[in-house]
UniProtKB/Swiss-Prot annotation:
The gene is rnhB. Manganese or magnesium. Binds 1 divalent metal ion per monomer in the absence of substrate. May bind a second metal ion after substrate binding. The keyword Membrane does not apply. Its cofactor is Mn(2+); Mg(2+). Keywords: Cytoplasm, Endonuclease, Hydrolase, Manganese, Metal-binding, Nuclease. Its main location: cytoplasm. It catalyses: Endonucleolytic cleavage to 5'-phosphomonoester. Residues 24-218 form the RNase H type-2 domain. It holds the Pfam family RNase_HII. It comes from Prochlorococcus marinus (strain MIT 9313). This is Ribonuclease HII.
Length: 218
């Protein structure tokens, strides 16, 4: 056996500990971009067999936040090929402002899950809060993106898709540094907002405090 696969197989039971062994179709779901000032929040949903999980772990699958851009990009096609099913969902900045970030995040997760072609026996949700919009069986997994291969895979797909979208939008919204911070609240982003004002894709509900101190939100 390949040493990487042997090592991954040794830790796979721990990483999959939150899965129901009697269930055959389990999806991991995770969000990306919850704290950003700009653009949509994304969610990924992935169904993996145990064999696929072990193979992906051997390739270095882990929480997307712990991966370099290059390693994450390399994992994306591997996840897409290995997964029984995968899908993405998103909720727009306008929906975030209208619904609030938690409800909008849940909407993105629901959209991802509804796009899966596979009927689900269980959904594993990253974090401590349940997915209120999902009517089927579910289980929350604290720090699930570092404990469950399906959730980690979902986070990688969502992160790669969202970051790619924001970087493509950087040329349309020039001057905000989106290609560098992909919408997060950095000093460069803050300065650009104060100089240029928010765009149509900024989350105005996130900027209220910034502009309350520094001027009008127009």
């Amino acid at each position: 056996m390949n040493p990487r696969i042997r090592a991954a197989a040794a830790v796979a039971p721990q990483l999959q500990a939150d899965m129901d062994p009697s269930a055959e179709s389990i999806a991991g779901v995770d969000e990306v971009g919850r704290g950003c000032w700009f653009g949509p929040v994304f969610a990924g949903a992935v169904v993996l067999t145990e064999v696929a999980a072990v193979e992906l772990l051997a390739e270095g699958l882990t929480d997307s936040k712990a991966l370099t851009v290059r390693r994450r990009a390399r994992l994306v096609p591997l996840i897409e090929d290995a997964a029984t099913a995968w899908a993405l969902g998103q909720a727009s900045a306008r929906e975030i402002d209208a619904l609030g970030i938690r409800s909008a995040t849940e909407l993105a997760m629901l959209r991802a899950l509804q796009r899966l072609p596979t009927p689900l026996e269980l959904v594993l949700v990253d974090g401590v809060l349940p997915l209120r919009l999902w009517m089927g069986p579910q289980r929350t997994v604290v720090r699930g993106d570092s404990k469950c291969a399906a959730i980690a895979a979902a986070s990688v797909l969502a992160k790669q898709a969202r970051d790619g979208l924001i970087k493509r939008l950087a040329s349309r919204f020039y001057g905000y540094g989106l290609e560098r911070h992909v919408g997060y609240g950095t000093a460069i982003h803050r300065r650009a907002l104060l100089d240029l004002g928010p765009t149509e894709l900024h989350r105005r509900s996130f900027l209220t405090k910034l502009f309350a101190v520094n001027g009008s939100l127009t």
